[in-house]
Design a protein with these regions (language model features):
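Active-site-adjacent "gating/activation" loops or surface patches in catalytic cores
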Residues: 1
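Well-ordered alpha-helical segments embedded in enzymatic catalytic cores
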Residues: 5-9
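His/Asp/Glu-enriched, well-ordered alpha-helical/loop segment
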Residues: 11-21, 28-56, 60-61, 66-77, ...
Length: 174
């Protein structure tokens, strides 16, 4: 979709009082989605919610630019993340994006910028793409690698969450 098509879809969803979920894995797609939401702001307050929660939910959010993490809370947009993808993608990330590893799943940064776990930071499973094992996402979010990964080998360990934060992200907001 073009940015204008995305903005038009958001406008239609708003007119019907429907929430919108957008799949955006990389930082370009995340930014385009947030930009489309900002374009709609003149007509729709950011605090508009549907019966299912905030108006906009962005699925995956595996790479987010530093400039965009504060925009989630400012726009009342949900970052719906599946941390388990870190475990399945770890070799590809190291091989293809070694210079961008610090931007992979910036979970701590989202929280620090106002995305409270269970409110604007949600975790999900992404079944059937990955196995239905929440332990994988707990490991990925807390260890930032596979079980037993030393901290100095973790991907962006400064983005680690506590188990309590993970439980909140899994349990609330749905």
């Amino acid at each position: 979709l073009s940015r204008q098509q995305l903005a038009d879809a958001m406008q239609r969803c708003y007119a019907l009082r429907l929430g919108l979920a957008v799949h955006a894995i990389g930082d370009g797609a995340v930014r385009a989605t947030l930009d489309a939401r900002a374009q709609l702001h003149s007509a729709v307050r950011f605090n508009f919610v549907t019966h299912a929660g905030p108006f906009l939910r962005i699925e995956h959010c595996e790479l987010i630019d530093t400039l965009d993490t504060p925009r989630f809370a400012a726009m009342n947009a949900v970052a719906s993340v599946q941390p388990c993808h870190l475990l399945t993608d770890i070799e590809v990330l190291r091989r293809q994006l070694p210079h961008r590893l610090h931007r992979v799943l910036p979970l701590r940064e989202l929280i620090d910028n106002g995305c409270a776990p269970g409110e604007l930071l949600w975790f999900g499973s992404d079944v059937p793409i990955v196995p239905a094992d929440p332990a994988d996402s707990l490991t990925a979010a807390t260890v930032r690698g596979r079980s037993g990964t030393p901290r100095d080998s973790a991907i962006a360990p400064e983005q680690s969450l506590t188990l309590q934060e993970c439980y909140l992200a899994f349990a609330a907001g749905r």
